[in-house]
Amino acid sequence: TLPHLLATRAAAGEGSNILTGKSVVMLNLQGGPTHIETFDPKMTAPSEYRAMFGETKTTLPGVTFGSHFPMLGKLAHKMAVVRSFKHGNGSHGSAAALVAAGGNPTKACMGSLYARLAGLNNAETGLPNNTLVVPAAMGKRYKDLNAVPSRITSTGDLPKAYQAFDPSTGSNILNDMQLNLPDGRFEDRRGLLQRLDELKRYADNGGIAGASEFEQQAFEVILGGVSKVFDLSDEDPRWMERYDTGHIKIPKGLPKKKKNGKAIPGFSPEALGKQMMMARRLCESGCGFVTVTNTGWDMHGNAFGVDDGMPILGPAVDKAASAFIEDCEARGLSEKILLVITGEFGRTPRINNKGGRDHWGRLCTLAFAGGGLKMGQVIGRSDKTASSPASDLVTNNMLLGTVMHTLFDIPN
């Protein structure tokens, strides 16, 4: 039962609570985002290496981002950008899994590790502690948008129970949260609603005053409507507009020009703003680890190249991620939520003959915001062509350590 679950979780944590109460949002740019056109434009390099669209100034003296990140540039003093992140793997599946796991020996993604240590559900709200937000989670209109969650949500050697909760799958968990019943069971539905109404009146009249702490908590979870977290309709329209990426469209003729053009419509970033808003809501309600996916970053030129992909995906990430940072600050959550922006690897320093860049594991995209970390800094630097780290190498294990120290109060 739910009261038993809550009591068990509390007992397990008595005297040994190592949780910091913070959350992590991992924005995973699937396909391998170019490190050059994002956070390391290298405009002093030869033309075939430097950022294709130039650079934009930031609030940090002498630091520039790629030209499609002007909003993030204005928030650079609230970010920590890494220009020396390297793991050496240039294969999609294994590199994505490596980054998602932070190289830990169980090969479980960091969200699963968190759930293993913190529990499957938040002890107070009942919300899953490890949640995946793909475009389809934002509604049926986004069901055809691409996502490859299997690469970044492996439980490795841990039990499958620690798999990320995916609200887009129509799982029984979300249905239970929403108290749905199949069509045709009207009498059962009416009976259930009547019983819930009676239960609410009973609670309102103080009838649960004598219940155990965990029975009361269970009442609050059921009657409080945990599923409301997944409904954006009560959000301030001004913030909805600030996050919104629905206006960013793929040019109609672009897919026909490409060898693998049929894949391009699935890369639309129109849901990304809503995904990031959902991530904030989840963290605000107690979810400890949220993974947000955004695809299309494999910019060889067969589908998207850097030349035609960055003008679409870049502004979407810029708007959604900057809105997330500003929203967290407005709500007093900046110290409580760590945003991590990364992908499976970077892209080749030299632009290819299709207007794209190919796989490159020797330098990768990585940036942070919030979480109580030191912001307003650039960590490490790349060499003159953004081919490899030139100082302060950052590894997968360091990424894992940063995330785990944010989530847990543990020694080095």
Can you describe what each PLM-predicted range is?
Residues 1-412:
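Ligand-binding pockets and gating/stacking loops
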